[in-house]
Amino acid sequence: MEKEYAIGIDLGGTSVKYALIDNEGVFYFQGKLPSKADESAEAVIGQLVTAINEAKAFAQEKGYKIDGIGIGTPGIVDCTNRVVLGGAENINGWENIHLADHIETETGLSALLGNDANLMGLGETMYGAGQGATHVVFLTVGTGIGGAVVIDGKLFNGYANRGTELGHVPLIANGEPCACGSVGCLEHYASTVSYTHLTLPTILLV
């Protein structure tokens, strides 16, 4: 099989992780930046461009031809129009962002865009613990909580691409308000940010 190379980006509320990988899942280069998610969408896009240019420079030095970029982002993503619609409460101003268009203009490389948890779940199905399985449920816990469901080897998106937002499944009836506008969501009680929010007052009282 002829090797093909791509840049993969995992955008989160805490960090931006990026890598140069091939079509067999082998990593050639990895990097990480502290996310500017609390600043603005423009600041975050600038970080993505910086990360991509760093990976591009490495690839050029080694003589690897990059075929494209894959970006995983929190929130609700319109994959057809390649737009972040919203729903990423941990990134300031991250809504109605034509992210793939921005990245292609800035870098000259074609870009694919998807929900971060969905893409991680698909990657785990193809290369990780889910290899050989036709049905997979994937859960990621970090600044927020995301999830993916793979049925017959294909991602299940549900209505308006919101079907696997597992972090916003109501966990506690009449629970505390979540940043998404609902109440009692899993993410509000079990993400790393919520853990700090819920436990810090108790720690300070000790």
Where are these regions (language model features)?
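Short glycine-aspartate micro-motif
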Residues: 6-10, 66-70, 136-140, 179
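Glycine-rich phosphate-binding loop and adjoining helix at the ATP-binding site
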Residues: 37, 41-49, 64-69, 76-135
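Short glycine-rich, Thr/Ser-proximal phosphate-binding strand/loop in the N-terminal lobe
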Residues: 3-44, 83-86, 161
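Short, acidic, Ser/Thr-enriched surface-loop or helix-capping motifs
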Residues: 22, 79, 150
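Residue-level signal for inorganic ion chemistry
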Residues: 71, 195
